[in-house]
């Protein structure tokens, strides 16, 4: 009996702990939801005539907060409180989310986030959840415009002025209201662009997907700000005081010149972020967008601390993320190996510490200092976390000037290696890389489906290599892995791109994988009507790679917002407490004591406190986080298996595996190649009706916008008219578009 007491006690303890954890998570979810809903409802109720003004007057006069503190409490504190609670939620949740059949619904059901409602147009593919969000914002804007219009008309009736002055007054109050709506848009503007945002991790929306929300909000915000400025300019022209007023810088009240500077910076960012400019002149867009610093600082000088506190919460979270990214990106990262495939695609294997965690659908930002110290480019990770603890791989397609320079740099390395110049470190070309990330989904959602359809266009196959590797490793090691049927649909232009298949060796990862995973790969070569002689073996060719010397022995830094939950939570909480403390102490011991009343100066002090709190309090956490990284990295490195030059952990297959590898299914057994045609997704989805039955099917698309639109349109049509015994397809996009 004694032999069974410990396991039983352990099981009871684990069950009790699970109940406590679930209860705490449920409580935190309820509290965060209540705070968010209350905050949004309160913002909507601020517009009626007297309610908002009366509340602000009451709180600011009856408490120690004052006007600035009251505005900060109403508009910014809810975001910061939700962020703090979100960090606690993620700490309690743990590192990994395991999907099992018990957690998955037995019957297919619609999901708001994966059902495409709009599949074409200016918004691209829009899910039902996103469509609801657009509707809520639309109602919010219409309601605010309506409420402010009523207030403007009521205000005009109170003043008996000449018709000319009446027009000027109407323009000025309209401009004031439009500026206020623009500020309310800015409350949300910086939340999606924070790459390691705790809020994005909470709702499991990756940064590459959230950027579209930033784009939408940016257009709306700048539209309101532009109309705001236009109303005032027209009014000043009517008065004949344009030059006099536009260069005024008032000590008390709104400082106009800083507002003009902020608006000009915003307009430059807005114009260069339009799709045509961004696509054809990305560097112009990228460098111009650094004017966000001018935009924010001069906005604070324009409106002062009182109004700037409305948008302070989102901007503060962005500054937190930006500082952490700066700290991570200062470290140079070793390139373990580099390889060029026949199709021109480059593969880089980068060194990473064993304690860095990421999901198969992650991506990184890469800088190569020999090419540019300013340019950072996003690339999907092609390796699985289970491929090895010490490396991460990316595939880079040569498309523009930066990637062409990288290809030339690798060519120089090949030549230097062939000429035996690598013996002299001073003579051979170098590749000095810096990395930000990894970023991506908080949970590996590809493991949430028993049935997967992976649709790729060209280099979009890269993240699917990571997915396949992740699934195969889990099947081989007996880990929790829900997917059992995977269909890969890959459209490419030429057969040269088949060489990308050499990036993953499926039989060597999981011998006899066909007994554990039903895998089909359908390849469509659109610009060739028939195969070339070498096409049958191109995927088997192993191309030589350059082994680069470990110049500094450095791997990627774990100082990332998506990294360790405890440290990222401490970074957020301590920095937030430090910011509020600095603002409070500054108000008590400086502003009130010395009777500081200049609006623009108080706005500058407010921004200074935001930056200083991140540098001082956040920097202190970063120092200890960095020390923890070194200690845990050394411990894990000593306890891990050795790594070969390609960055892969040594794996010794058994005799049965070796025999299996010799007679294992060839790639042709699960790969079908079609020439001169494009994927017919309606036929593909209909063919799965009888094969898979009534199940949930996760469809992940990585490719150009036209591919996403085509797939989303077929999924929407199939989902609406599907029979009860047919699969329900869930649309997921994994395409990155800045």
Curated annotation (Swiss-Prot):
GO terms for biological process: monoatomic ion transport; response to light stimulus. Residues 328-445 form the FAD-binding FR-type domain. InterPro entries: Cyt_b245_heavy_chain, FAD-bd_8, FAD-bd_FR_type, Fe3_Rdtase_TM_dom, Fe_red_NAD-bd_6, FNR_nucleotide-bd, RBOH/FRE, Riboflavin_synthase-like_b-brl. CDD domains: NOX_Duox_like_FAD_NADP. Expressed in shoots and leaves. Detected in cotyledons, stems, siliques, flowers, sepals, anther filaments and stigmas, but not in roots. Heme binds at residues 214, 228, 289, 302. The keyword Transmembrane applies. FAD binds at residues 377-380. Residues 50-71, 147-212, 313-334, 588-602 are extracellular. One of its GO terms (cellular component) is plastid. Its EC number is 1.16.1.7. NAD(+) binds at residues 437-440. The keyword Transcription does not apply. Its cofactor is FAD. The chain crosses the membrane at residues 30-49, 72-90, 123-146, 213-236, 288-312, 335-355, 565-587, 603-625. PROSITE patterns: FAD_FR. Keywords: Cell membrane, Electron transport, FAD, Flavoprotein, Heme, Ion transport, Iron, Membrane, Metal-binding, NAD, Oxidoreductase, Transmembrane, Transmembrane helix, Transport. It catalyses: 2 a Fe(II)-siderophore + NAD(+) + H(+) = 2 a Fe(III)-siderophore + NADH. Residues 178-299 form the Ferric oxidoreductase domain. It holds the Pfam family FAD_binding_8. Residues 1-29, 91-122, 237-287, 356-564, 626-738 are cytoplasmic. Induction: Down-regulated in shoots by copper deficiency. Not regulated by iron availability. Light dependent expression. Ferric chelate reductase involved in iron uptake by shoot and leaf cells. May participate in the transport of electrons to a Fe(3+) ion via FAD and heme intermediates. Belongs to the ferric reductase (FRE) family. This is Ferric reduction oxidase 6. It comes from Arabidopsis thaliana. The lineage of its organism: Eukaryota, Viridiplantae, Streptophyta, Embryophyta, Tracheophyta.
């Amino acid at each position: 009996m004694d032999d069974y007491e410990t396991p039983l006690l352990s099981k009871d303890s684990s069950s009790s702990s699970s109940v406590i954890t679930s209860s705490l998570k449920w409580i935190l979810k309820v509290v965060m939801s209540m705070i968010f809903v209350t905050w949004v409802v309160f913002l909507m109720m601020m517009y009626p005539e007297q309610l908002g003004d009366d509340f602000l007057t009451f709180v600011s006069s009856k408490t120690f907060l004052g006007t600035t503190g009251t505005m900060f409490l109403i508009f910014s504190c809810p975001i910061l409180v939700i962020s703090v609670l979100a960090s606690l939620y993620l700490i309690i949740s743990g590192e990994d989310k395991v999907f099992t059949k018990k957690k998955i619904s037995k019957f297919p059901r619609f999901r708001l986030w994966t059902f495409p409602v709009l599949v074409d147009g200016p918004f691209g593919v829009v899910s039902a959840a996103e469509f609801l969000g657009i509707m809520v914002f639309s109602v919010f804007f219409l309601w605010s415009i309506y409420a402010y219009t009523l207030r403007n008309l009521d205000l005009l009736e109170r003043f008996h002025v000449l018709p000319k002055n009446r027009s000027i007054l109407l323009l000025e109050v309209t401009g004031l209201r439009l500026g206020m709506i623009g500020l309310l848009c800015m409350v949300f503007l910086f939340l999606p662009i924070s790459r390691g945002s705790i809020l994005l991790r909470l709702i499991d929306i990756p940064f590459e997907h959230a950027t579209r929300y930033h784009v939408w909000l940016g257009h709306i915000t700048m539209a309101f700000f532009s109309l705001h400025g236009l109303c005032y300019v027209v009014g000043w022209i009517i008065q004949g005081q344009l030059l006099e007023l536009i260069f005024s810088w008032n000590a008390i009240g709104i400082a106009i010149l800083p507002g003009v500077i902020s608006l000009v910076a915003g307009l430059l960012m807005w114009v260069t972020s339009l799709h045509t400019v961004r696509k054809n002149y990305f560097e112009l867009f990228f460098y111009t967008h650094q004017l966000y610093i001018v935009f924010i600082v001069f906005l604070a000088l324009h409106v002062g601390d009182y109004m700037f506190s409305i948008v302070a919460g989102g901007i503060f979270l962005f500054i937190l993320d930006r500082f952490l990214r700066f700290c991570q990106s200062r470290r140079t990262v070793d390139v373990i190996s580099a390889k060029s495939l026949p199709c021109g695609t480059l593969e880089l294997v980068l060194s990473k510490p064993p304690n860095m965690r990421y999901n198969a659908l992650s991506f990184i930002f890469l800088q190569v200092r020999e090419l540019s110290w300013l340019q950072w480019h996003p690339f999907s990770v092609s390796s699985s976390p289970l491929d090895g603890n010490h490396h991460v791989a990316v595939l880079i397609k040569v498309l523009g000037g930066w990637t062409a320079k990288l290809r030339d740099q690798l060519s120089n390395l090949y030549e230097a290696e062939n000429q035996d110049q690598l013996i002299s470190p001073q003579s051979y070309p170098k590749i000095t890389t810096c990395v930000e990330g990894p970023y991506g989904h908080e949970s590996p959602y590809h493991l949430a489906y028993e049935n997967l359809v992976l649709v790729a266009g060209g280099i979009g196959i890269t993240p699917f290599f990571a997915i396949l590797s992740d699934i195969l490793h889990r099947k081989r090691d007996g880990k929790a892995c829900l997917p059992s049927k995977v269909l890969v649909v890959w459209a490419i232009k030429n057969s040269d791109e088949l060489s990308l298949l050499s990036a993953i060796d499926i039989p060597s990862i999981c011998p006899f994988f066909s007994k554990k995973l039903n895998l089909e790969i359908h390849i469509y070569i659109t610009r060739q009507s028939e195969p070339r002689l070498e096409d049958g073996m191109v995927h088997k060719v192993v191309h030589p790679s350059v082994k680069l010397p470990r110049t500094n022995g450095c791997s990627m830094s774990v100082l990332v917002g998506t990294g360790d939950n405890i440290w990222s939570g401490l970074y957020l909480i301590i920095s937030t407490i430090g910011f509020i403390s600095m603002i409070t102490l500054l108000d008590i011991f400086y502003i009130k004591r010395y009777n500081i009343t200049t609006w623009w100066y108080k706005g500058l002090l407010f921004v200074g406190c935001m930056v200083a709190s991140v540098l001082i309090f956040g920097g202190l956490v970063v120092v200890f986080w960095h020390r923890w990284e070194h200690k845990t990295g050394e411990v894990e490195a000593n306890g891990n298996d050795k790594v070969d030059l390609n960055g892969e952990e040594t794996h010794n297959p058994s005799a049965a595996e070796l025999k299996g590898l010799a007679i294992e299914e060839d790639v042709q057994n699960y790969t079908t190649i079609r020439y001169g045609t494009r994927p017919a997704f309606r036929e593909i989805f209909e063919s799965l009706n009888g094969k898979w039955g009534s199940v949930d099917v996760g469809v992940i698309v990585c490719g150009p916008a036209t591919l996403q639109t085509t797939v989303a349109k077929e999924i929407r049509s199939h989902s609406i008219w599907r029979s009860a015994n047919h699969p329900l397809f869930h649309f997921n996009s994994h395409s990155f578009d800045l």
